[in-house]
């Protein structure tokens, strides 16, 4: 009886171990994203593409701002999310490196540093630059001859009526408004800014278009779709303040080893995404109010990535 019990226990223990290993093998890939329009779009692109290839996912899209999502990745609370090459300069502590001003060089540097330090893998980026920018209402820009941030600096110094809608992240991060103000020698007073909850440029652009609380300028991204339609003009950045922000999927090494097909699934998709394409897709969400998941699915089907 004792021998039987021991054997039974060994069989049971083996079964439990096998079940545990099986659960580990099939545990879903947890995909997060930031809360901005493009973050939601790209997060859903990743979810739908992996699901269509038979990889189970847990949708954590629209998780939070850059700090929240990055912290979740490093803590192992999510497995992957779409990030931007230019953010590597600030996440990895090498802001002065000129590599960040070039898409490929910035990508290779971020890929190397993040893997060495954190075992985070950067998959291939899109050929697009979603850099931070400042956009001004066209009527204001035309009336005051504003084409570049040098012109904005002159206008602000001359007490021109200027009020910027932006996210708290853009206002506070050293590579956001502080970088523009330092490079172009202007300083906005508190009453010249309107901080909007979240980080979505759809809200900041609309605030400028609708003159909300006197706003006539907005934090914007290089791949924002509705700028022209809503009558806003991006101010040129002749001093090249901003790094190149090319979107790329980031994934924990452990998760990629668990599902090595992820790289071959996502690489051709991200390579198909250029600036004009992202502008069009973002516009469907920001202007037409379409659901990011629907827009992502429509794009993937139109290119034959999913059925």
Regions found by a protein language model. Give the residues of each.
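A bilobed periplasmic-binding-protein/Venus flytrap-type ligand-binding module shared by bacterial periplasmic
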Residues: 132-142, 245-259
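Short, polar/charged alpha-helical segment
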Residues: 37-56, 178, 182-184
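Extracytoplasmic "Venus flytrap"
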Residues: 28-46, 62-65, 169-172
């Amino acid at each position: 009886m004792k021998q039987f019990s021991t054997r039974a226990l060994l069989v049971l223990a083996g079964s439990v171990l096998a079940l545990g290993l099986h659960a580990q093998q099939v545990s879903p890939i947890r995909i997060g994203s930031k809360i901005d329009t493009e973050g939601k779009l790209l997060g859903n692109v990743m979810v739908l593409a992996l699901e269509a290839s038979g990889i189970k996912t847990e949708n954590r899209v629209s998780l939070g701002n850059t700090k929240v999502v990055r912290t979740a990745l490093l803590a192992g609370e999510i497995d992957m999310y779409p990030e931007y090459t230019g953010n590597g300069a600030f996440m990895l502590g090498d802001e002065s490196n000129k590599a960040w001003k070039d898409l490929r060089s910035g990508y290779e540097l971020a890929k190397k540093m993040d893997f060495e330090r954190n075992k985070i893998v950067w998959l291939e980026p899109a050929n697009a630059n979603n850099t931070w920018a400042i956009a001004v209402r066209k009527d204001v820009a035309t009336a005051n001859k504003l084409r570049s941030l040098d012109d904005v600096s002159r206008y602000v110094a001359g007490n021109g009526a200027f009020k910027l809608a932006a996210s708290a992240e853009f206002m506070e991060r050293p590579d956001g408004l502080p970088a523009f103000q330092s490079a172009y020698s202007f300083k906005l007073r508190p009453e010249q800014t309107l901080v909007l909850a979240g980080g979505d440029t759809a809200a900041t652009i609309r605030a400028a278009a609708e003159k909300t609380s006197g706003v006539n300028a907005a934090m914007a991204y290089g791949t924002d779709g509705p700028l022209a339609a809503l009558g806003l003009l991006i101010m040129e950045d002749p001093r090249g303040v901003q790094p190149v922000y090319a979107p790329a999927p980031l994934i924990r090494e452990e998760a990629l080893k668990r599902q090595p097909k992820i790289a071959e699934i996502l690489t051709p998709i991200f390579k198909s995404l250029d600036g004009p394409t992202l502008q069009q897709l973002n516009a469907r969400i920001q202007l037409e109010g379409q659901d990011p998941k629907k827009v992502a699915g429509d794009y993937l089907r139109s290119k034959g990535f999913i059925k």
